[in-house]
Amino acid sequence: MDSRLLHDLKRLLGADGVLHEPADLLLYEYDGSVEVARPDCVVFPRNTSDVVEIVRLANRHRVPLVGRGAGTGLSGGALAREGGIITSFARMNRILEVDVENQRARVQPGVVNADLSLAVAHAGLHFAPDPSSQKACTIGGNVSENSGGPHTLAYGVTTNHVLALEAVLPTGELVHLGSSAVDSPGYDLLGVFVGSEGTFGLVTEITVRLTRLPETVETLLAIYDSIDDATETVAEITARGITPAACEMMDGWTIRAVEEYVHAGFPLDAAAILLIEVDGLREVAEAEAEIVADVCQLHHARSVRVARDAAERDLLWKGRKNAFGAVGRISPSYYTQDGVIPRTKLPATLRRVGEIGRKYNLAIGNVFHAGDGNLHPIILFDERNQQQFRDAVRAADEIIEYCVEVGGSITGEHGVGMEKDRLMPLLFSEADLDLMKRVRSVFNPEALLNPGKIFPTSKGCGEIYVRPQSPVAAPPA
């Protein structure tokens, strides 16, 4: 990196606000995906003014710039694919304002998702998007990826809960999108910005909608001896006119991994479980819970139980939300995918996932948002074995290709990033992709902000078939 740029960044942020030594950069080569990319430096702004100056400096020196929250993303979105500066929002983590009466809050992008809900729980409110990483992921990252979570089924994704944004464009221009009003005139630039994966600008403030906590929550655990029976239950519940707050599925392999780690009370001999939640007014929630239990039993659930209290409910959800961590304890590496399919295609798709695993001799666990058909196959491999790594990537691609074949999508909530850019042509024509690039160029004309993301590049998929080793982490010769 140019020494003059480094000097200017240190003068702006102080020596403790800039990292550039190889050992210090190691953490920032990674996120939650299998991708690796090294930045030239990492900076830590304290406020919007710092971000404006960082962007202006990067623009002046023609250096790529990438925003980063907690680094929990699963598509390489927060990695510096082409080097340059990573802007970490770890120090911009304040809840600036809470308006209980109007059910909204204004926050900096580094606020942790779960921390906001904890801060407003006393008022009977919460922030509805709930990714499994909600105890670590940031609201700024949620905005960039348009994150969802188990309760997306009833409450929607992040864009449904964002009222307004303050953002810095790649030119250093500060813009305000949306408003606290129910609707605002003009083009829906806010809607375009949310989910743009950091390619339009760096978000510095977010006004979010807060949602009332439901009067009653009924959480059911249904246990099955057949995966097909579990998947058919999901379609039947929605066919009965019930939209659960959440409807999660876990297969037998994942159940055993989770139970050894969390001890949530999942039966080790089950082929699958469904974790279903209905909420709302007491009479409605209790009635819907009875219908859901009946449907589960109609489809041969071995047993159905309702959580007796909040403690039991929290334990069940702890099991679900720690699934990825549980897998990490028993495998050197794992690759989490994120495809979407119609609910009616769940049985066939899970069978196909099993076939792909056997083809490559790889174990694949399944834990996912069954209610909206958002799959998260977890492919186990050892990254020290390059052939296993290549096979894991090929297996992941084949799973996503099948999702598209049956009428689904290449991603539901993890984003495209640098992981799936090569798969975009499965869904979009050249004309479609060109139109998207033209929209990006309105905000980011020089493509200096988060370059190499979303759109296919000349590097193609070969870039991740041989995972580079960090010179810091590499063993001595």
At which residue positions do the language-model features occur?
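A glycine- and small-aliphatic-rich helix-loop capping segment at beta-alpha/alpha-beta transitions
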Residues: 75-93, 121-125, 148-159, 206-212, ...
